[in-house]
Amino acid sequence: YLESTLNDNDISLLLLGNAKNGHMTKRDCFIKMNCDESDYHESNQLEAGFQIWRVCDESIKIVEEWLKYCLDFDIINNAPSTLGDELSGFVGHYNDQSVLTNLAIRDGLTVGGQDYRNFIECDYDYWYERGNAGYGREIDKFLTQLKNA
């Protein structure tokens, strides 16, 4: 998957979620990050739980900036926005995911689709507890082999 998705110039692989960033990001986050534009609002939000980064000066700079924004209480907290009204359809603030998504849009970082789920399992023991009922994915086969080894 990585070989087919990344090229030599990519510094990261970030994974696309299903929800609009504007529905999952409070307005203060957009405003304080200078990202209060429709491109940021209308793009799908990334999932921050699984990321791949190439170690290089550019990726280190972006991750350091991500941390800086995540340490800004006005950007990261779940309190209602004070700098502007929440966008139509706003559901709730996804904190670090919101910040990461804004940075990825701004910097044009590489984003992969949902097919990565065929290769990862976050809670691998969970489906074992349901009688080895996996989903037939490659990761399910691999984890079953590990369990039975």
Language model regions located:
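Glycosyltransferase catalytic domains, chiefly GT-A lineage
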Residues: 1-149
